[in-house]
């Protein structure tokens, strides 16, 4: 049985415009930086450690988007919160069988 997630946990983006992204998400969502190093930053607007993360491709892949490394800009991944571990597992089993 597939169970709908309870909430969107976080979104991770790959960017070459780190400062602009941090400024924009700070202004629009009231997000604050929880942790930052030269290659990445984690932002939150509530009690979670992070709701947004940004990977700075100008640090990770300074030569550009090599098709072999697939370091393109955009969404890296989404994470979801499920009501329980059992609900997550049941959804996994259901999706795996499709």
Where are these regions (language model features)?
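Vicinal oxygen chelate
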Residues: 14-20, 78-98
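Short acidic N-proximal helix/loop "leader" segments that mark the beginning
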Residues: 1-5
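Conserved acetyl-CoA-binding loop of GNAT-fold acetyltransferases
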Residues: 27-34, 98
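Conserved short beta-strand elements that form part of the metal-binding/catalytic scaffold
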Residues: 32-73
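Eukaryotic phosphotyrosine signaling hubs
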Residues: 8-10, 73-78
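N-terminal capping/interface segment
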Residues: 6-8, 14, 42-44
């Amino acid at each position: 049985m597939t169970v709908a997630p309870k909430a969107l946990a976080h979104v991770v983006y790959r960017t070459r415009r780190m400062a602009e992204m941090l400024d924009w998400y700070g202004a629009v969502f009231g997000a604050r930086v929880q942790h930052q190093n030269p290659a990445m930053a984690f932002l939150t607007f509530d009690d979670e450690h992070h709701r947004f993360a940004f990977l700075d491709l100008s640090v990770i892949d300074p030569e550009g988007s090599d098709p072999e490394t697939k370091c393109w800009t955009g969404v890296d991944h989404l994470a979801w919160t499920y009501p329980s571990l059992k609900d997550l597992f049941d959804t996994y089993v259901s999706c795996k069988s499709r």
